Amino acid sequence: MIRFEDVSVTYDGAATPTVRNIELDVPEGELVLLVGPSGVGKSTLLGAVSGLVPHFTGGTLSGRVTVAGRDTRTHKPRELADVVGTVGQDPLSHFVTDTVEDELAYGMESLGLAPDVMRRRVEETLDLLGLAELRERPIATLSGGQQQRVAIGSVLTPHPRVLVLDEPTSALDPAAAEEVLAVLQRLVHDLGTTVLMAEHRLERVVQYADQVALLAGPGAPLLLGAPAEIMAVSPVFPPVVDLGRLAGWSPLPLTVRDARRGSGELRERLAGHEPRQPHEQPQTAASPASRRSRLRSGRQPEVPAVAEVAGLAVRRGRVEALRHVDLSVGPGEIVALMGRNGAGKSTLLSTLVGLVRPSSGTALVGGAVPHRTGPRELIRRVGLVPQEPRDLLYADTVAAECAAADHDAGADPGTCRDLVSRLLPGIADDTHPRDLSEGQRLTLALAIVLTARPPLLLLDEPTRGLDYAAKARLVTVLRGLAADGHAVVLATHDVELAAELSHRVAVLADGEIVANGPTPEVVVASPAFSPQVAKVLAPGKWLTVAQVREALESAGLAEDGA
């Protein structure tokens, strides 16, 4: 169905090809997962299937790419639209209408389908993706994850024979991601749809793949094989595979269920050991009752909170986005906000940075009211890395972005560039931000915000588009900031990140905080927000492979060579 024959792609101005001598054959009715580190050319390969590369992106494509027998060099994207449906990393770039229902119908209108067929397919897709309640909502009012589901639905309604998906679950909460992947699996198994998908969150998707295609590095040859075989040699792999490598399991498990079945011996080796938390929770501002108790006992009061929210409510049009929210974040504390798409996480961050005015209640950052504080003063108190990094990027080169960030923050020249070098090794000064991958743009935006070293750092889906190595670098930077006394609040659907990094997790649902406590207590008790290691080794409090590795090594129990 999809065939690459000796394909190389070189973009205008590039000295070397982004991908080189690619050979790939995807049979009809299979789901093939494309994996590899950030920046190796995965999005380029996906774009070549839909014809966007080179017709839209420019550059030179040598070799041959065919989809259902059509050569993408001689067929422009509009001539492939009846065969190929594409969802890129940025859902906003897909939308051409204003409301959810209209967007789902647009692709079918373009193909001239009958009105009764269009109506039936729209209803089916609304139900399949859990969008029925949003059918009349303006797309601009949806959360990032809801927009991503609409983008996926808009390519499902025309019933293409081939689906090309770039990070389709990156902005989805765990439950919504499972729903989308279940729909894709049904299309593959029942309708014979061919799916080529790139995804960094392998813990979500690798078990659904018929085959895995690995691009290990820029210009590297493509390896294609069974998921377990490729995961054994891949530089990127999910926690359950990492745990299997550590424990010496063969074959490597791809699912929590498989890992649990083989975990008996590992449980015995861990018996009597307790996971060491990678960092202790710092002193934070406590509740009024706790303060009175401490004063009566003569102990020192807590350090003042960097951010404090009390009785906060926010209305956005007819939607009550937040209600009765109480949250306090102290210096050096890392708090993860979790919850379904549309639960109010991004709204809470926007309120703390002054973009949204509360309907009632209070929000204070460093003692100041955010929406009443001027930008130059606010930037020294709080910084936000938004879901869409392009909101912060406007210059033509990475060097210009960094120079502007240094100037705005009053930092020494080179401060931002040094951060970029730590987070994004190998990115040249003259690189245009639009030429970076989604994850790389997000990391550049993070470096720009960190230049001012604000006491409070807010991050909205900070690992979207990041591979495991980039995520590890991000964790190191954020831990360093917390150790220096900076408070970090991140809204995330990445349960593995929350388990590894955060001191505390607050779960939001329908605009309210329904759980708020130490990370192990909150995530282990939640099937939706529990990391893979916790599920495998439950009811223990193990959250990460690093904790297991440390326990085994301290007892001299690790496998040789693990």
PLM features per residue range, with description:
Residues 10, 53, 64-79, 362-377:
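ABC ATPase NBD Q-loop/coupling interface
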